[in-house]
């Protein structure tokens, strides 16, 4: 297992198969789950996915409660509403992911509700900071180039009647509402969501088409995500490894090892620890070792499978691929000479750099 060849935040996949989305390839299934649900599939989900058609699987995933929970966490990260700035939990049935999954609100309405929250106000105090962040994050605007709009927004924030894009208001909620009424709001939202999922900017013509579609049918955001993930551009993305976010790494690690996601308290505690260091890679490996040592992991025993099949099983389960010839030979040799157990192989894989990518 060689060191990665990185380009930005990506690393090349050695020997990956060319072509489109292939659900018989466990790495493709793992990538879909990480992108849509923020975690890897458990064994039953992987088996079901590998016997499904891509469009059928994506209809099952996109728009599910798990999809919206992951999407919402990504929005909180984008707006830096973390830890003490996290929005108040209104309780089951009233959380934004619950309302989104029930079709009671749209993604654009959920973004607006997030920016209207008291948490967003606490995280961005003062008229200059608040208005600048709203314009920049919702519209992609460079406020230094629009001083008149910035000043009008600040007056409106302070309770004085002012006009933005021809609409009048006199409160900070008016600043947000008027900003969300602009056509660039939907376009900026789709631009960043496409880039988040595919790791590249969308074609301008396609972005304009999607924007028009979403403004006409605000509830159709999951259908756009399905279109993106079935596109040749996503298949191309799968030829490159992308680094997992801290949440993706933690949730995927727990599902891979224990077949269940971590509880909220454990997830947030580990996420904060990873976010506190400049390079989270070594600490990610420590968390993997600790989890392996402290949990009952359902793994085939040393004598349950021929050693070659055991090595292949570990690579497919945790990396979604077959081991290369040199990897297979090395792992077999170490396993036989050291008389170790299967968890030693798992530790080697889950603490390696490649496991931190997908």
Over which residues does each language-model region extend?
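Composition-driven recognition of low-complexity segments enriched
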Residues: 2-358
């Amino acid at each position: 297992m060689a060191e990665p060849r990185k380009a930005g935040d990506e690393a090349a996949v050695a020997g990956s198969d060319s072509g489109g989305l292939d659900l018989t390839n466990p790495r493709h299934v793992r990538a879909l789950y990480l992108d849509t649900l923020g975690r890897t599939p458990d064994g039953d989900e992987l088996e079901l996915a590998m016997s499904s058609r891509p469009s059928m699987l994506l209809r099952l995933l996109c728009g599910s409660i798990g999809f919206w929970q992951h999407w919402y966490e990504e929005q909180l990260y984008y707006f830096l509403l973390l830890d003490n700035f996290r929005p108040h939990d209104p309780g089951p049935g009233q959380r934004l992911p619950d309302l989104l999954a029930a079709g009671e609100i749209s993604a654009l309405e959920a973004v607006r509700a997030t920016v209207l929250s008291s948490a967003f106000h606490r995280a961005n105090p003062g008229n200059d900071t608040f208005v600048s962040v709203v314009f920049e994050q919702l519209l992609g605007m460079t406020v230094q180039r629009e001083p008149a709009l910035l000043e009008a927004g600040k007056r409106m924030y302070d309770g004085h009647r002012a006009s933005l894009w021809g609409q009048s208001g006199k409160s900070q909620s008016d600043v947000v509402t008027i900003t969300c009424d602009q056509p660039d709001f939907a376009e900026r939202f789709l631009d960043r969501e496409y880039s988040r999922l595919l790791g590249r900017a969308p074609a301008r013509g396609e972005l304009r088409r999607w924007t028009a579609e979403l403004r006409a049918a605000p509830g159709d955001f999951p259908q756009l995500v399905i279109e993106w993930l079935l596109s040749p551009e996503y298949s191309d993305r799968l030829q490159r490894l992308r680094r997992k976010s801290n949440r993706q790494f933690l949730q995927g690690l727990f599902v891979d090892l224990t077949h269940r996601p971590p509880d909220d308290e454990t997830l947030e505690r580990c996420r904060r620890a990873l976010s506190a260091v400049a390079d989270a890679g070594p600490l990610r490996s420590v968390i993997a070792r600790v989890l392996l040592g402290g949990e009952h992991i359902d793994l085939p025993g040393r004598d349950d499978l021929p050693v070659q099949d055991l090595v292949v099983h570990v690579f497919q389960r945790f990396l979604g691929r077959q081991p290369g010839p040199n990897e297979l030979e090395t792992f077999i040799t170490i396993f036989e000479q050291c008389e170790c157990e299967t968890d030693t192989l798992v530790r080697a894989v889950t603490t390696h750099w490649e496991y931190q990518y997908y």
